[in-house]
Amino acid sequence: MTLLIRPIFKVGEGSKGFLLRLAEANGLDIGVIDKLGIVFDIAVLNTLGYLPADFENTSLEKYAKSLENTLVVHGKSWNHKVPRFCPQCLQRDAYWRYEWELLFFDACHEHQVWLIDRCSECYQLLSWKRSSLMRCTCGADLRVQQAVRCPKAVVRLSKALSHQVFVTNNELPFYIVAPINLAQLQRFVRMLGTYGDSTVGLMPKRLKVNEELVNSWQLTSLAAEILDQWPKSFHMMLDSMQNRPG
């Protein structure tokens, strides 16, 4: 089904963010978009007119195909449960970046701040079911939320995650992750962040997977510091594990 207002998908935009932008433009709930069969699929978007007429052989086509492939191949690498964002990015351009939808992408590597997933007005987690891309369900403007500076190691981890989705000519922040793909890097982060915690025993009940920043920042902070000082910090982690209870 073709909707009346058809915003064009952008380079750098996230799949979930685009669908919410589409829903808002047409005064619909994002759940209605799903019921209408409008999903992030290049063939579907092209047929419905959500891609430019001169789409082929453009940077947008290359980006859209790479994103679609990553969504299919690494479906579990995405955090589509709890939205998160950088207010400074939204102030500049009103669209949802694809990186914000990645699991363990906790910081904006451009502005070097922690992302936000909880409204400072109502203190509730953001929801994809909100009616406006730029506002919380309570009506608060996301662009004026205050972000907090984050450690430089976490910034570099975010760059590494971004690089694993779309390989660039830029040098990887951590040489150790060069041979692995996105899903493998995220599992590595989860492992380092879990076992790097000195309060965790040798056999934790389960490796944490949590889409909320209040929990994931602890994993990414520990993992980023270990990767940033590799292999010294990794050896220190192993030494620490020898002295922990089983």
Please give the residue ranges for each predicted region.
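Basic, alpha-helical nucleic-acid-binding regions used in initiation and control of genome expression
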Residues: 1-246
